[in-house]
Amino acid sequence: MKSILDETIELSSDLISINSVNPTFGGIGEKEKSIYIKNKLEEYNKNYSIKNCEITEYNTVDSEGIERPNIVSKYDFGKNDTLTIISHMDIVPEGDLGLWNSDPFKAEIKDGIIYGRGSEDNHKGIVSSFLLLKMIFEEKIDPKYNLNLIFVADEEDGSKYGLSYLVNNFEDEIFSSKDLIIVPDFGMPEGEFIEIAEKNILWLKFKITGKQCHGSVPENGINADLIAFSFGKGLYDKLYGKYDGINPIFNPAFSTFEPTILKNNIENINTIPGYVELNFDCRIIPKYDPKEVLSDIENYIEVFKNEIEKHILHFDISEKENISITYEILKLEKAEETKKDSEVVKKLGSAIKNVLNKESVLCGMGGGTVAAFLREKGYNTAVWGIGDETAHQPNEHIKIENLIKMAEVYLDILK
């Protein structure tokens, strides 16, 4: 059998070499990576003579006809409760290659660190899951819990074809209320932080219609850019002003309402645009209901339109009634919080103390993980890992020793 170090390097290197960029971002998806994972699971079953394993594929097809795979590997150790570890197979694009010091899809190892796209997000979950299996069967321990290893698609684009698909269609088949669920899709360098809460996520696309005209005669049209600028700033001020509560478990501790994408329908400098799209990324602390935020947005749209003269100096007043501001909800994920005294939080905290010699710290975050879907269904879920916070960045990387430490923490829970 390979050493734990050699196994870690091989698994990480193999996964980095398989491009599984989410199709929404122009990639080919997770199929090839899922084949590798399933074959590796079967290889482990053979090498360690594992008889109590059931591997099930829950594949679906997305709107573009691309197969989106999900794998659930169950290990029955004859126990009443189950430790469930959920990792995702899709990755984000590599971005500007000029910012990388190496090929993002060819692992590079330097000073005990492995570099490559996906190395942290979320290969650390996949690799540490396999290392856990290696430890269980080489050390021949009798685990206190059954074990479920779940590998899902589509996390980077909202999980419609991944965990959301599993929870909405196969919940009773896969999950139990007694499960200890860990999502290794977060992590700080020392590994002491356990994420138990996420902010509500609300992504909006505003569609703003004015009237296109020549740039030299603004009074013949309605400048949709100006509407977008003024509307965006006004909405920004209104939402930050009203939803100003603080929850210190998060960093930042407040809700955020940030305009992001702004684009119009013209390419030449001497045309006033008649149509603009403006996107907002809202991360709302759990005390506030996103439905209330949406209601305030709808009210603000009407107020803004009625006061349009305050925002544009020169425009075709006869077309005022044709000004349109509508919105599309791109994502709405309502957040629930894992109980601080839940079994998974207590067991994970104890394992962190035993293995890492760190006192665990409970926290929340503004980013989203698949834990949101489970918490919404009432499952206490801990998001945890060890990493250097390089996800989605050029030169993404992770320390090889931290992949092994993650598996040791899981193992401590099972002992």
UniProtKB/Swiss-Prot annotation:
Domain of life: Archaea
Record keywords, A-Z: Cobalt, Hydrolase, Metal-binding, Zinc
Cofactor binding, per record: Binds 2 Zn(2+) or Co(2+) ions per subunit.
InterPro entries xref list: ArgE/DapE, Bact_exopeptidase_dim_dom, Peptidase_M20, Peptidase_M20_dimer, Peptidase_M20A
Record: active site: 90, 155
Cross-referenced SUPFAM superfamilies: Bacterial exopeptidase dimerisation domain (SSF55031), Zn-dependent exopeptidases (SSF53187)
Single annotated GO MF: metal ion binding
Record EC number: 3.-.-.-
Entry cofactors: Zn(2+); Co(2+)
Pfam family, one: Peptidase_M20
Statement: the UniProt record of this protein carries the keyword Hydrolase: yes
Entry binding sites for Zn(2+) 1: 88, 121, 185
Binding sites annotated in the UniProt record for Zn(2+) 2: 121, 156, 392
Protein family per UniProt: Belongs to the peptidase M20A family.
Official protein name in the record: Uncharacterized metallohydrolase MMP1398
